[in-house]
Amino acid sequence: MRRVLPLAAACWLICARAQEPVCKPYAPCYSKESIVSAASGAPELAPNTLASIYGQNLSYVTRAITPSDILAGMLPVSLEGSGVQVTVGGFYGHLYFVSPGQVNFLVPPNLLPGEVTIQLIREGTAGPAVRVRLKDAAPALFQLDSRTALASHHPDYSLVSDEAPARPGRWVLLWATGLGAVTPPALYGEIPTRAARLENLDKFKVLLDGTPVPRENIGYAGLAPSWSGLYQINLKIPDYAGPDPEIRLVAGENASPAGLRLPVLP
């Protein structure tokens, strides 16, 4: 399977907007509402979800993860020179990006659903300890823009867009986070090197204009190799698909936010 790191890095630059907290001078400041899914901007998280903290005074520097930060296939818990760490339920969250107003991290995959405490520490100065409830899944599609889901044509990985729409009967790749447990399980800190399908695949659905696509149209749903927290769905567009349908993902009782469309030209 082709590496998806360049695409995932592009996904990571698609930033959600969150409520601005009221901050005290100097200390890291954020709120429960400003800890959100990095894909959708919704305050819904699950284990193995790519997440963002928005606030003030989160870091003195701006840094994104680089290959040199990854040692022996393990993600960093702090980016060199930043002095920033995030703890989630007593474990360090692995970092992808830090800046004064935003920090991107991975919710540890070994956590269980339920309430956890999230706290950001900047060079020994701690921000508030915020209580957040983790769901078993918090589906969220990465976005090309505020109303368009991010998708790639198969097999060349070019972007699906209004200028290059998907077609019925053709395969596309969708990119998401928060889809829940996989088999074999995601391991704490380790970058996945092989495919790992959703554990509850029978409870996973892709909805186009509210209608579940046939099971045989989902060729794969699970981790995207080479990038922790990123999920890949291989979807064959149904022959009946209309133009630019709304697309949502459902994992168990949890659905991705409404309002995103997938560019399709019947």
Annotated model-derived regions:
Residues Q19-P266:
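A sequence-level detector for low-complexity, Ser/Thr- and acidic-rich stretches
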Residues M1, A18-Q19:
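Initiator methionine at the very start of the polypeptide chain
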Residues A9-A18:
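Hydrophobic h-region of N-terminal signal peptides that target proteins for export
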Residues R2-L7:
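Sec-dependent signal peptide recognition
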